[in-house]
UniProtKB/Swiss-Prot annotation:
Protein name per the record: Tetraacyldisaccharide 4'-kinase
Catalytic reaction annotation: a lipid A disaccharide + ATP = a lipid IVA + ADP + H(+)
Pathway(s) per entry: Glycolipid biosynthesis; lipid IV(A) biosynthesis; lipid IV(A) from (3R)-3-hydroxytetradecanoyl-[acyl-carrier-protein] and UDP-N-acetyl-alpha-D-glucosamine: step 6/6
An example Gene Ontology biological process: lipid A biosynthetic process
Species for this entry: Salmonella typhi
Stored NCBIfam families: lpxK
Database matches in Pfam families: LpxK
Family: Belongs to the LpxK family.
Xref: SUPFAM superfamilies: P-loop containing nucleoside triphosphate hydrolases (SSF52540)
Superkingdom to which the source organism belongs: Bacteria
InterPro entries registered for this protein in UniProt: LpxK, P-loop_NTPase
Swiss-Prot/TrEMBL keywords: ATP-binding, Kinase, Lipid A biosynthesis, Lipid biosynthesis, Lipid metabolism, Nucleotide-binding, Transferase
EC number(s) on file: 2.7.1.130
A Gene Ontology term for the protein's cellular component: plasma membrane
Amino acid sequence: MIARIWSGESPLWRLLLPLSWLYGLVSGAIRLSYKLGLKRAWRAPVPVVVVGNLTAGGNGKTPVVIWLVEKLQQRGVRVGVVSRGYGGKAAAYPLLLTPETTTAEAGDEPVLIYQRTGAPVAVAPERAAAVKAILAAHNVQIIITDDGLQHYRLARDIEIVVIDGVRRFGNGWWLPAGPMRERASRLKTVDAAIVNGGVARAGEIPMQLAPGLAVNLRTGARCDVAQLSNIVAMAGIGHPPRFFATLEACGAHPQKCVPLADHQTLAPADVQALVGEGQTLVMTEKDAVKCRAFAEDNWWFLPVDARLSGEQPDKLLEHITSLVR
């Protein structure tokens, strides 16, 4: 229902317009207060790159963060990552991730980024506190913040927006009548707009999510996902249909698709109940970090990597690298 409202297919969005105007007024006032200097943002002693969204819901932001971290690491840059840690609850903040940190403590996306990149990752509702925790423990040269475009309390040097190329901005209205956290005109002020799927417009960077080999959660064995039989597909991400479509494009045709809420807590019994005799469970990598501790032999995940096209990605990386002292 929310998807139909936000796309404009359902007329119910009109009933939510008063709340949207209020949301837009408050969010605009917050941004203006920082722009005018009425509120002061904290500036880190190293450059800060924000990777965020203009809309609610999954746009492919985490793969972009991983891509950016890995590309900078390849250039010899020491990178740290901060996040709010949505979906997790730590005993105390800021929380600096270790190999023992669970998704229940830090959230699924920070744990995924930490496991994939090996970069220092810290989470805290106040992102400045997370930055300070990383700087106190690691000699990093640059900070990437996973989400936080609207978190103006942390000053930033580069802003990158990730856009769902199929859904774009829906009906264009602020939450809750539409998907917008900020209006589309905000794109004029960011340093780069990366478009996940669909067709990128002039000045935007095209991106595709390229699937790799399926990985067994228990053994680490790898195989072509199309070789797996009797698949039950599970996706607890912002836009589950994207994952199911990826499986189909890989030649894997699930018998059943189970969409879950983004960041949903997964209990062992609930996940086990999804898979019947002779079936194979295939999930996203973000779900896998939550399920690895209680995984069965027939559970697999399909990793995806961001692939950015054209000359703009290299120019963006050169610009970011030039900020490192």
